[in-house]
Amino acid sequence: MNNGIRFKLFLMMVLEIAIWGSWQVQIFNYMPMLNFEQWQQNLAGSMFAIASVVGIFFSNQFADRNFSAEKFLATSHLIGGAALIGAAFTTSFMPFFLCFLLYGLLYVPTISVNNALAFANLKDPARDFGFVRMGGTIGWIVVSWPLIFLLGAKSTAQEMRWIFLVGAIISFVLAGFSLTLPHTPPRRDVQGLDKLAWLKAVKLLRRPYVFVLFVVTLIDSTIHNGYFVLIGGFLKDPIKMPDNWIAAITTIGQVAEIVTMLMLGSVLKKIGWKWTMIIGILGHALRFAVFAFFDKPEYQALIIAVQVLHGICYAFFFATLYIFVDAVFPKDIRTSAQGLFNLLVLGVGLLIANFWFGSLKAQWTSAAGVVDYHKLFLVPTELAVVAMVMLLLFFKPPTDRPEEPGASAPAH
């Protein structure tokens, strides 16, 4: 195939996920600077979950059927970038939330449209999409580096607004770049949301192994998203990392993700679905346990080092989950089944994490403003252990391992 097109699609994915990565790690450090109440922080932090649910049930299908992919991307990122600028320069809650929500409602559908555009223009998607998708992970890593120079070691709210401004700048760049992508017309033959397929996918929950995997995915999605709710504040205080290095430190996990994804196929062949997923959840348990028991500045090096566990947490559970659905579920409902699990990962799990962990953090913060991170991080540690036990005892898939593993999950 044309390597120029493949590189364009790779660069498209770099820019796409860089927008998301620009604000994700630091937003829960920024909102307290604006004196938002806890429920307001929880609600604003749940923007992505709200937009994901809307996207899964409406806007993704609307975009697919009515717009050429490249024009939809250009328009969405142009308006979304303007919305991020609005969020950066407002300091009262409601205008901030409305700008941030508008950005989310425009941005979330572009993730699916990006994937659709890539699949439509790759000669061999099974072979080439992994390379394109890796661009998203690289984008998440690269976007943290400008913040080292734009933020201070102890940033003010005025400095911290750069997390949105960087995202806005990338949005504008991607809006223009999208118009250079291959023309991909709307799929007018698509019938929107296949309600029968979704119903069949939900009915699969009657099968014990599917129900167990569904519950475990909800648990793991909650603690995975809880990491992003808590990590910024944890690294800032008590670990005492400079504000401008926090995002860069967390990208160690994305570097590890690239390495782990390269190992995933051989690991699945050797130990199968169940044990690969158990190891993925074990990564969460170990990471949160380290956070709980070593929550002091003198353990900075250890806290930085365990960020590599993100690669195991993500690839060995979430990427394996998507491969499992593609390999085991009936062909006619695989897309709906993927959407069902996406609803947990990007929607319900994220929503629970923002409200629950945000509320627990407020509850376990002293009058002097000191957070009991030991108690706080024991919660996801214990949940991860419960999820591992559930998989170990009750997850009995129809096949032990894939014949030819190979698939790609959404970047995060």
Regions found by a protein language model. Give the residues of each.
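A membrane-interface helix-boundary motif in multi-pass transporters
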Residues: F149-I169, S359-A384
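C-terminal ends and interior cores of transmembrane alpha-helices
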Residues: L78-T91, L282-K296
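Juxtamembrane intracellular "pre-TM" segments in multi-pass secondary transporters
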Residues: M1-N3, L181-V215, D237
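Helix-to-loop junctions at the C-terminal end of transmembrane segments
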Residues: G55-S68, L151-G152, V259-W273, K361-A362
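Cytoplasmic helix-loop-helix junction between adjacent transmembrane helices
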Residues: L101-G135
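Hydrophobic core of transmembrane alpha-helices in multi-pass small-molecule transporters
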Residues: V14, A83, F93-S112, L218, ...
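Helix-loop boundary and gating motifs at the non-cytosolic
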Residues: N2-A49, Y209-T217, S221-I249, F318, ...
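Multi-pass alpha-helical transporter architecture, strongest
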Residues: A87-A88, S171-P182, G347, Y373-H412
